[in-house]
Amino acid sequence: MSLESLTSNLWTRHGPSAEQLLSDRRTKIIATLGPSSRGPEKIKSLIEAGANVFRLNFSHGSHEEHLAVLKDVRKVSAEMGAWVAILQDLSGPKIRISNVEGDYCPILDGDPIELRFSQDKANLSNATTIFVETVNPMTTLKPGQRVFLADGILELTAEKVSSDHVACRVAKGGRIRSRVGIAFPDSDVDLPATTKKDFADLEWGITHGVDYVAISFVRSAEDIDQLRKVINEKGSAAGIIAKIERRAALDNIEEILTAADGLMVARGDLGLEVPLEQLPMLQRKLIEGANYCGVPVIVATQMMHSMITAVRPTRAEVSDIAAAVMSGADAVMLSDETAIGEHPQECVRYLSRVALAAEQTFEFQEYKLRLRDADTQTVPDAIAYAACAAAIKTKAEAIIACTETGNSARLVAKYRPHQPLYGLSRKETALRRMALYWGVRPIFFDSGENHDFEIESSLKVVQARLKIANGTRAVVTGGRSTKTPGSTSILEVRQMNYL
């Protein structure tokens, strides 16, 4: 590919318009809500900038705080006519330190520092003593072993283990914040994927209708099945996102992909489990595996870390985002950048611009070759594959997936069609779930009681909403029974002549 052809489809130095960002971008954006981004006006600005999914991090905040945020998201998105999903991220058994005096404090290279075990909230960490929750460092560490804080940004070395504390030395200093994660990479710490707190938080999430639940530190499909049982018993439609953070998850990735509704490449904790130089290769392999199975995959952690304080991303961050998009990621996620950062709206806007630019060079043909042997044994999957092929052969300008659960749209997205993809449903839960799927633009419509009405009304809705010219072809998928999940078995190529 020549430099001229590579740049011919990109924009001027001013970048794409806000309208382009929202209408053209296929990769979805997840923004974590926190102190920097709470409140109706800030949430509205993030949606306008391009956020599709909002993450509630249950490692921080109370149920009351999260409920206020959830209500704001639902109210604002309804007023804007935007289908936005809410992702509840369970904290899992992540080992954390206590709150810090003054919320943060510096520790310097070479300084002595003690680790102590405490579950008393009154004990505050400082520059000389760090209180560890969940795991007793005295029974976990041996002299010479490493201790990582804040995803490895800070590093300690254990020097002496006593009955009531572990004496350490700061190997890599920095600033510690309240309740940051702490890891023992040289120790074998075996903790369950889901804690009592997680089940209490999950109960809250189901009660208040979250769209996705992320389970941390997954080891196997059994962890997901355990969570699924609770969700199903409560009658919830929430999808489960498996966060890949442990070596055990890598060993069991095939069964995890079969059990989960989505995958998150959680590079922070995963980068503590494997050598950092292996992380890019693992990320690519995880994306390929999820793509092959048609499971949405999210790339997360430090996507734009510098923008917690800086007004623009680094060149390396921009390249990292582009690499994730061009590898086939369905979504990219912002964490501290939007939760506690100084420029949450700008972070989302930059991320949207970079993702959209990267998509202009996405190798659709190479991607389809990668998927040519993918599982198309089910009828809905075969229909999805055929819809993408038919759209190319007939020069259709849109693909419409009429769906009860959102699953049909997800399957079409698996094959990464060039054409705009619209997911039409009468169910709000399905419309919000589709907010995570690559390239899917959710639209509400009442499917009616029969197939013919469904096809006609879907074409009318899409043409009227998007002002598509008469005579334009569209590929439509649906089922004979319009309100039966999993019944997609029909594909039609139709002309839109309703304006």
Question: How would you label these PLM feature ranges?
Answer:
Residues 1-499:
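Non-catalytic helical/linker scaffolds that mediate oligomerization, partner binding
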